C-alpha cells in the first residue's frame, strides 16, 4: 500500500488473476519435461559463477570448455531437472556473441530445458529462434509451448531497466516463462530492515508479474526474489546470511499468498 495507490493495486490484482497456476516447461525429450507450479519442486544448476575449480587444475576463470563440462554433468545427474543459467561464465567468448555459443552448447550437450539471459531485444530474439528451431516448432506452436525461461532482475529500487523490459515483452509474447526476481540488498538499494527490504521485493515482483499479463494474458510467470544484506563496513553483498534465509522464508509465503508459482 505504501508504494501503490488503491487504483493501481486494483489493476495489479486484476492482472495477476490471469497468471496460470501451473505450466509445463518442455524439454527436447519428453521425459525431461518439468511441471512447474502446484506442489512441484524443480532443481537446477546455479548460474553465472565467474570462476570454477577442480582437483587437477585448481581455481580459474570460467571458459567454454568448463561450461560444456558442467552441461555434461547436468545432463547426467537426474536430480537436476533442468540446466538453469550459465553454470560458469565462459569469459573466453566475447560478450557480444557469448549467448549464441552458450545456447548452441545447451542444445548440443543436453536435452533438458534451460535458462536464457535477458540482455536486450536482439539477444532474446536470437535465443527464441535458436530454441524454436531446436524444438522443431513454428512460432505459433512455440507460443503455446514453454521451452525455456529467463530470470528478470529489477533495478531496485522500483524500476526495471530497458533490456530487462524488452526481454519480458519478447518472452511473454511468445509464451515463454519469466521469473521476476527483485535483487534487493538491505542497506544498499533497499531498506536496511528485512521487513522493509521484503516489502520492496514484493512490490517490485508483483509489478513485474502484472506487466507480463499486460503483454499477454495467461503468459507463464513466476515470483522470484533475492533479498539479502550487505556488509555494512564494505558495502559488499553478503550471501548465505541469516537475514538472507529470513527473506527467503517470507518471500516464499508471499509468493504462495499471491501466486502458486514460486522461484527463489
Predicted regions located by residue number:
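Single conserved hydrophobic/aromatic residue that forms the stacking wall/gate
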Residues: 1-8, 12, 262-263
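Short, conserved glycine- and acidic-residue-centered signature motifs
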Residues: 4, 63, 199
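Catalytic alpha/beta active-site cores
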Residues: 9-191, 195
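Glycine-rich anion/phosphate-binding loop at the beta-strand->alpha-helix junction
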Residues: 151-262
Amino acid at each position: 500500500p505504501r508504494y501503490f495507490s488503491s487504483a493501481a493495486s486494483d489493476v495489479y490484482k486484476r492482472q495477476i488473476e490471469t497468471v496460470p497456476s501451473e505450466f509445463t516447461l518442455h524439454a527436447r525429450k519428453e521425459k525431461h519435461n518439468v511441471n512447474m507450479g502446484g506442489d512441484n519442486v524443480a532443481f537446477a544448476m546455479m548460474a553465472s559463477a565467474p570462476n570454477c575449480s577442480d582437483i587437477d587444475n585448481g581455481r580459474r576463470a570460467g571458459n567454454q570448455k568448463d561450461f560444456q563440462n558442467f552441461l555434461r554433468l547436468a545432463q547426467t545427474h537426474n536430480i537436476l531437472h533442468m540446466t538453469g543459467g550459465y553454470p560458469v561464465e565462459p569469459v573466453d567468448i566475447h560478450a557480444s556473441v557469448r549467448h549464441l555459443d552458450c545456447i548452441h552448447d545447451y542444445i548440443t550437450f543436453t536435452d533438458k530445458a534451460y535458462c536464457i539471459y535477458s540482455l536486450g531485444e536482439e539477444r532474446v530474439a536470437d535465443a527464441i529462434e535458436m530454441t524454436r528451431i531446436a524444438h522443431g516448432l513454428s512460432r505459433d506452436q512455440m507460443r503455446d509451448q514453454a521451452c525455456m525461461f529467463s530470470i528478470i532482475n529489477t533495478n531496485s529500487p522500483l524500476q526495471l531497466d530497458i533490456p530487462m523490459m524488452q526481454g519480458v515483452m519478447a518472452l511473454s509474447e511468445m509464451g515463454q516463462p519469466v521469473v521476476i526476481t527483485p535483487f534487493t540488498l538491505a542497506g544498499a538499494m533497499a531498506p536496511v530492515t528485512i521487513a522493509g527490504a521484503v516489502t520492496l521485493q514484493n512490490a517490485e515482483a508483483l509489478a513485474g508479474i502484472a506487466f507480463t499479463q499486460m503483454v499477454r494474458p495467461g503468459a507463464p510467470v513466476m515470483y522470484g526474489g533475492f533479498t539479502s544484506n550487505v556488509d555494512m563496513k564494505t558495502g559488499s553483498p553478503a550471501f548465505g546470511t541469516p537475514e538472507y534465509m529470513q527473506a527467503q522464508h517470507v518471500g516464499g509465503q508471499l509468493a504462495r499468498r499471491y501466486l502458486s508459482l514460486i522461484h527463489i
